[in-house]
């Protein structure tokens, strides 16, 4: 097994694309990162190892038990807390942070009161699991039967928010309480899956939203004693941010930092875990991230100037994230030109989102 000459090995619970990109980010600093599948064989875990995870929940296996019992599993108790939407939303209420009105849906007798107090349209979400739009239902009085008896107690119900648009912020907290934040990012989701992210520090409301988002996420990380990168997704309603979801890990909406920032979110996470010196983050230029979902590899993407392709090496399946493309340039007109070129190299279902990104940059 390879070892760093400078730092303990960082083991990542989960071996998907996030673990893979953490491994790439560590290499230039001689930080050895080893992503591990849940069913990988157990081994002699070094006493000084650092443990992190690329996902909030994991199955119980001999390996996850081994890692879970290690003294250096950073944020271990926080993963379970935030993986459950009931405890996550309870935390937001405890901190008096804005989020959509909600309740635990325990039984069918709650429906009438729920529609009266929350609204005629509610979003029902599984407490655990369910991501990228899965495990969620939009419920009105006429389709309440969609929530079957076995789901009661295992779901929360939120008010449906007719938001203006969606944003996120990715930040990190160090052991001494210092924090670093990336710019608020505008996101477009389609069918519950993040498809596009756009970053431009010249956006209207950017400075106001940045201050608000940093305060909110900072308050959460301080309360939890969190160390590492965390993401906060929000709805924008007028001049207010409503927290939608928290992710205690590197996040899809932070992928643009690989090209558009002085330190990527993956390197930042490792720096925080190892308590390494870290300057303030510098954003180089406006940036766009395009998720590649259920799309076969196209070598013509490599011919797009100022584009950075990340291909995950996964089997292509409908709805599966298989890669992403980052674009960054100080001149937004140049990014728009490259997005227009991508319009001819991506399937039809990408066109509306590419047009959304182009309009964002105009």
Curated annotation (Swiss-Prot):
PANTHER family membership: PHOSPHORIBOSYLAMINOIMIDAZOLE CARBOXYLASE (PTHR11609:SF5), PURINE BIOSYNTHESIS PROTEIN 6/7, PUR6/7 (PTHR11609)
Span of domain ATP-grasp: 89-274
The protein, known as: N5-carboxyaminoimidazole ribonucleotide synthase
Recorded GO CC terms: cytosol
Keyword DNA damage: no
Assembly and binders: Homodimer.
Similarity-based family: Belongs to the PurK/PurT family.
Record's keyword terms, sorted: ATP-binding, Ligase, Nucleotide-binding, Purine biosynthesis
EC annotation from Swiss-Prot or TrEMBL: 6.3.4.18
Pathway assignment: Purine metabolism; IMP biosynthesis via de novo pathway; 5-amino-1-(5-phospho-D-ribosyl)imidazole-4-carboxylate from 5-amino-1-(5-phospho-D-ribosyl)imidazole (N5-CAIR route): step 1/2
A UniProt-annotated Pfam family: ATP-grasp
Catalytic activity, reaction form: 5-amino-1-(5-phospho-beta-D-ribosyl)imidazole + hydrogencarbonate + ATP = 5-carboxyamino-1-(5-phospho-D-ribosyl)imidazole + ADP + phosphate + 2 H(+)
């Amino acid at each position: 097994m390879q070892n760093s000459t400078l730092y303990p090995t960082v083991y990542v619970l989960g071996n998907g694309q996030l673990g893979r990109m953490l491994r790439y980010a560590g290499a230039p600093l001689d930080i050895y990162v080893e992503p591990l599948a849940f069913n990988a064989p157990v081994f002699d875990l070094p006493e000084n190892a650092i443990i992190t995870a690329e996902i909030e929940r994991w199955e119980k296996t001999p390996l996850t038990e081994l890692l879970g019992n290690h003294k250096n599993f950073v944020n271990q108790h926080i993963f379970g807390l935030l993986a459950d939407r009931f405890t996550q939303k309870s935390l937001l209420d405890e901190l008096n942070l804005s989020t959509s009105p909600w309740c635990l849906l325990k039984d069918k007798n709650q429906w009438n009161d729920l529609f009266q107090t929350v609204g005629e349209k509610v979003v029902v979400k599984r407490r655990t699991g369910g991501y990228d739009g899965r495990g969620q239902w939009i419920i009105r009085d006429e389709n309440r039967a969609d929530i079957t008896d076995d789901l009661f107690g295992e779901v929360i119900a939120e008010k449906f928010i007719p938001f203006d648009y969606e944003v996120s912020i990715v930040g990190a907290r160090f052991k001494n309480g210092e924090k670093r934040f990336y710019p608020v990012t505008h996101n477009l989701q389609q069918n519950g899956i993040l498809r596009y992210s756009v970053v431009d520090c010249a956006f209207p409301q950017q400075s106001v939203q940045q201050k608000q988002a940093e305060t909110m996420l900072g308050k959460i990380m301080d309360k939890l004693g969190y160390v590492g990168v965390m993401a906060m997704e929000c709805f924008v309603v007028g001049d207010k941010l409503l927290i939608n979801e928290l992710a205690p890990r590197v996040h899809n909406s932070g992928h643009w930092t690989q090209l558009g920032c002085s330190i990527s979110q993956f390197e930042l996470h490792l720096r925080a875990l190892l308590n390494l010196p870290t300057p303030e983050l510098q954003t180089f230029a406006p940036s766009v991230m395009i998720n590649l979902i259920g799309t076969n590899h196209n070598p013509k993407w490599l011919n797009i100037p100022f584009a950075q392709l990340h291909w995950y090496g996964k089997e292509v399946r409908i709805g599966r994230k298989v890669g992403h493309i980052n674009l960054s340039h100080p001149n937004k007109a140049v990014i728009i030109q490259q997005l227009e070129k991508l319009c001819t190299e991506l399937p039809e279902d990408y066109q509306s989102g590419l047009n959304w990104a182009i309009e964002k940059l105009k």
